[in-house]
Amino acid sequence: MSEVTVKALAEEVGTPIDRLLQQFSDAGISKKAEDNVSQTEKQSLLSHLQKEHGGESTDGTPTRLTLQRKTHSTLSVAGTGGKSKSVQVEVRKKRTFVKRSALEEEQRAADNAKQEAEETAQREAENVAKRKEDVRLAEEKAKRDEENKAKRNTEDTVKREATDKRKAEEKAKRTVAVKQAKSETELLQLRREEEAKRKAEEDSQRQLEEARKMAETNEKNWSATEQNVTANMEKSDYHVTTSTHARAAEDEQDRKEETTGTRRKKKPAAKKADDRKGRGGRNQRNQRGGRGKQKPQVNAPTSMQQGFDKTATVAKSDVVIGETIVVSELANKMAVKATEVIKAMMKMGAMVTINQVIDQETAALVAEEMGHKVIFRKENELEEALMSDRGETQAVESRAPVVTIMGHVDHGKTSTLDFIRKAHVASGEAGGITQHIGAYHVEIGNGMITFLDTPGHAAFTAMRARGAQATDIVVLVVAADDGVMPQTVEAIQHAKAAGVPLIVAVNKIDKDGANPDNVKNELAQYDIIPEEWGGENIFVHISAKQGTNIDGLLEAILLQSEILELTAVKEGMASGVVIESRIDKGRGPVATVLVQSGTLRKGDIVLCGLEHGRVRAMRDENGKDIESAGPSIPVEILGLSGVPAAGDEATVVRDDRKAREVALYRQGKFRDVKLARQQKSKLENMFSHMEAGEVAECNVVLKADVQGSIEAIADSLMKLSTDEVKVKVVGSGVGGITETDAVLAAASNAIILGFNVRADVPARRMIENENLDLRYYSVIYQLIDEVKAAMGGMLAPEFRQEIIGLAEVRDVFKSPKIGAIAGCMVTEGTIKRNNPIRVLRDNVVIYEGELESLRRFKDDTNEVKNGYECGIGVKNYNDVRVGDQIEVFEIIEIQRTLD
């Protein structure tokens, strides 16, 4: 074969020249489009392509085989509104098979033979099982057919008996009706026959009389006349007889048609006879064919009736309901329109919309009312699975006690703890009042104790209650000079509700007015009995200022903890409770967690209420970074997605993704439940709000440094609300005051309250531009007092009348311009010109008006004091008499307060 160029070879084999050059290059042959290609190079290229693409081997069989396959399918995906949509799915598969050696072929052949034998045996076994199953199914089908046949025969027998019975009853009724109609028809026919007979006899008598007269007058024509009379009689009798027989025949035919059985529609016999007979008693029904023909209405037997019977009830189904559900979703689950669900709820007394969220109980009542079976969905399956995968161990060890110090304001709680810790904590709190829950652990000679210092102010009830729930022992600090105070009683109630033992520390025994015995007597009224009186409570007399008997208090705490035998799981995944939380600028959300079991380590994944995250850093109460914390150790953790609520449970889990899902589920559940309750409260309070009318509102935007302070302040502000002024917290949050808070305050006409926080630069600029009211506080007393004052300014003022002067009329003069002028002597106070007056006669008010003129001698004056004479002109009143009294008063506006 002669050599050809690469370009000619490409045209010959029908491939692009670039691709052919690339194939030459892959085969190790460098060519250009104008170069010649020899036979050897062609053979080399062919060998390379066969090796590359699975060409034929030496025996002519291919060594590589590539298969491509496409499959198309349709997938139904559920959409909104209960509808589904179809999605086209294309699956592409590509497989390459390479020929193996002869040994592998033999092994594969043996394997294939073995596999075929196994498959054959399996198919035979399946066929045998299938035949057995077919036989069993055939027997069951035959049995069901026999049962159905017997059931149908029974039902047919019952139906036939019922049909025969109904036919017999209808036949009896028709027979009675026919007999009644027949008797009436025969009576009417007899009357008509008698009338016709009587008429015919009268006609014949008249004709005979005429014939006799004619015979007498004309004897010749007798024979002809007699014949005519006879013919007329026969003719008359013929017509009368014919009509009578015709009517009888027609009536007989009607009776036959009436008694043809159940095929003719049943009608009252009397009505049928009256409808069918017209003038002269003849049957007026059209018996001819054509469009006007009235066909008899025939009812088929009951067993032979056919027709479409619309199902009266919808198909009942099982409805799965979660914690909350939207009305439209509930309608989709029940396969009904949303309007039907809304109608059902309106009948039950609830007004809802199609997109409204309803709670589980309401949805269950609606579904059961509409005849469906309700299945309550277990919403927290993922949460339970996540909690069960924590791998907790059962090895428990003794742990340090968690002690909460409670008591009234300024009774020395923080000072006692301060002396124990050898640090001045109280000086760091604003006004010496504890605003947060301080958590500290103290190392002493015999072990370790964790202290929780709770605020004593009444506004921090929720924080104090959380402290009691997380503690093992409560130390109640009572001042020896003050005794039992309101917050002391509240702390006792929290300790009893939590079921924790109570140790009483009688503080300030170094003061002159200290009376520890009086404290014992007062506490005995609340079932706090000292041990020396036979009770269970330990009383320790201390002085936090001097440090007196502090060691005795610690020994009492350790003694009580030994009695309780406190244990916890030390190793394993940690769990605890959030004591406090806040947003730290630069570090983000910070939560103070008291570890209750396990060991919390840096890098653990924590699920904390509605928030989650990985522990990026851990700090102790002194601000030092630590790597781990065991049971009864309070720590600050960083890395959560948001600020958790104080009192939430903090749990370490394994999977970050599942923790995020559980947190999102909790947030959605919290939001749905909140919306459902909010809607319910709106409906319930709608009429009460309409009746109450307009009420002044004091809107507040509240920002604080920690979550507990927000709860305490918001609760205190809500308690300030009265019937005339309501306090409404339109926005609250942890952290500094931002521009968003300022915008919210401007939109709602609210004042901004910052508790231990400050506003940033954009927020201050916005506040200045909008002229908003921004106030900073560090002590809760001042905040509550100023809000109370602001609410007092919103109250409607009170007006009071105050008498400033009294004048007695001594004489009356007449003036042409003014009228009656009263000459008076001022007996009390001062008479002023521009004030309103009252005229009293015998101590009874007879007129109320104003002064028109006030003169002393001839000069006008503005006021006349006690003991002087004056002339008074009363405007629009001339009936002034001697002896009357003129009382001058003024209206004073008094600003009301909430106290």
From Swiss-Prot:
Region feature (G4) = 507-510
InterPro entries (alphabetical): DNA-bd_dom_put_sf, EF-G-like_DII, EFTu-like_2, IF2_assoc_dom_bac, IF2_II, IF2_N, P-loop_NTPase, Small_GTP-bd
Location, primary (coarse class): cytoplasm
Q: Which residues lie within the region annotated G5?
A: 543-545
- G1 as annotated region, ranges: 407-414
Sequence ranges assigned to domain tr-type G in this UniProt record: 398-565
Q: Cellular component GO terms, alphabetically? A: cytosol
Region described as G3: 453-456
Q: Where is the composition biased (Polar residues)?
A: 36-47, 73-87, 296-308
Give the span(s) annotated as Disordered.
31-227, 240-310
From the Swiss-Prot or TrEMBL record, state where the protein is found.
Cytoplasm
Chain sites annotated for binding GTP: 407-414, 453-457, 507-510
Q: Where is this region: G2?
A: 432-436
One molecular function GO term is: GTP binding
**Where is the sequence biased in composition, kind Basic and acidic residues?**
101-173, 181-219, 247-261
* Keywords, sorted A to Z: Cytoplasm, GTP-binding, Initiation factor, Nucleotide-binding, Protein biosynthesis
Superkingdom of origin: Bacteria
Instruction: Give the family this protein belongs to, as stated in its UniProt record.
Output: Belongs to the TRAFAC class translation factor GTPase superfamily. Classic translation factor GTPase family. IF-2 subfamily.
Function text = One of the essential components for the initiation of protein synthesis. Protects formylmethionyl-tRNA from spontaneous hydrolysis and promotes its binding to the 30S ribosomal subunits. Also involved in the hydrolysis of GTP during the formation of the 70S ribosomal complex.
PANTHER family tied to this protein: TR-TYPE G DOMAIN-CONTAINING PROTEIN, TRANSLATION INITIATION FACTOR IF-2-RELATED
- What's the name of the protein? Translation initiation factor IF-2
Q: What is the lineage of its organism?
A: Bacteria, Pseudomonadati, Pseudomonadota, Gammaproteobacteria, Vibrionales
